């Protein structure tokens, strides 16, 4: 290797392969000579290449990484300098960055994207509570701890600032493809630009390219300056929760964009069920209630509680690192899933009986809705949902149930008292009960595969890696 291409020298470390490079820095994989050859990453910043802005970015990055400690934020272990370089010594992430991860797989399944989003949202919530905005969120700045069951690590805080939703800086920061429109169009922006960037990352992970992906800078500029609503592709099919979040994140007007509080509480982000030390405690509390209801013969209530408990048990299973405790927990989870499936059969038979009994009421309601085309149309969708349900097409049936219920609930609020309102209320109750049952049924199937060791994230990665 020519001397000019050799990595810099740093006492106590052996610098090896180059991991990446930017305008003023190069990152190397390195080994600490002591401490059992600990593996780290070292960002080597050439002093010669630093202008005033670069110095400010570097100082910002060091200041923030020194003070923030979070499982999903890259850890700064130390920083040193000599006459030629400033060295940032960080934890090493063997999985590379999210950009490469997406590129090698083209698109990611929604469930994998949700796991990644939870981790990113967790880091952003931590930063938001400290009034820190990243301002350069993009897949290249999100690292993966490893390829097998990776954890995301938010990195590269060179553009970060201490700011809130009221602040309005003037300087243009970040990467255009992931940059919120207000950063370009008005130059006045606040912390909400990070939410737009999350939307772009989410879009790219699900659809394989960013919404403003362009062949030239002029085309990119045109898309950024446009007032057109961001259209979501119809394929791959997304859950209603995922689609709703994307649409709320990718609002060009920051005042119409989802707020941080709403984002952290959103059903698709679901921070409540993110793997953590608390999830096992919550799961245990719920399963105790489920067993009590089960013993009392309250099957429907017991099924609901078992399902709620499993929503915490599965992330608790992923969080547990001790092999023996994990296996014991998995055994218990399998028992609870088996009991939930038994209860499903009991509840389903009575549930379906109610559904079929509701047919005559539904037909009568249709007759009474001849003068209300919108109500009649929603009832037709409900009938289609029941037909799909009878065919065993749970996913399609659930979509149709939710579609019809959205309309019927609006109709109910506007309906005058009388026989039609009574029938409509009864129909909604029946459809809602069946929709909730199907949701729980689909979740139980997912939990079963996860609890049996087919851990969603690592399984997907293994399948993807086998194609390379």
Curated annotation (Swiss-Prot):
Keywords in alphabetical order: ATP-binding, Autophagy, Cytoplasm, Kinase, Nucleotide-binding, Repeat, Serine/threonine-protein kinase, Transferase
Highest taxon in the source lineage: Eukaryota
Record bears the keyword Nucleotide-binding: yes
GO CC annotation terms, alphabetical: autophagosome; cytoplasm; cytosol; phagophore assembly site; phagophore assembly site membrane
Active site: 136 (proton acceptor)
Ligand binding (ATP): 19-27, 43
Subcellular location: Cytoplasm
SUPFAM superfamilies assigned to the protein according to its UniProt record, in alphabetical order: MIT domain, Protein kinase-like (PK-like)
Gene name for this UniProt entry: ulk3
Family membership noted in the UniProt record: Belongs to the protein kinase superfamily. Ser/Thr protein kinase family. APG1/unc-51/ULK1 subfamily.
Protein name, UniProt field: Serine/threonine-protein kinase ULK3
Pfam families from the UniProt entry: MIT, Pkinase
The species this protein was found in: Xenopus laevis
Domain annotation Protein kinase: ranges: 13-269
Residues in MIT domain copies: 279-347, 374-442
Signal peptide positions (record): none
Record function comment: Serine/threonine protein kinase that acts as a regulator of Sonic hedgehog (SHH) signaling and autophagy.
Taxonomic lineage of the native organism: Eukaryota, Metazoa, Chordata, Craniata, Vertebrata
GO molecular function: ATP binding; protein serine kinase activity; protein serine/threonine kinase activity
Catalyzed reactions: L-seryl-[protein] + ATP = O-phospho-L-seryl-[protein] + ADP + H(+); L-threonyl-[protein] + ATP = O-phospho-L-threonyl-[protein] + ADP + H(+)
Gene Ontology biological process terms, A to Z: autophagosome assembly; mitophagy; negative regulation of smoothened signaling pathway; piecemeal microautophagy of the nucleus; positive regulation of smoothened signaling pathway; protein autophosphorylation; regulation of autophagy; response to starvation
EC number: 2.7.11.1
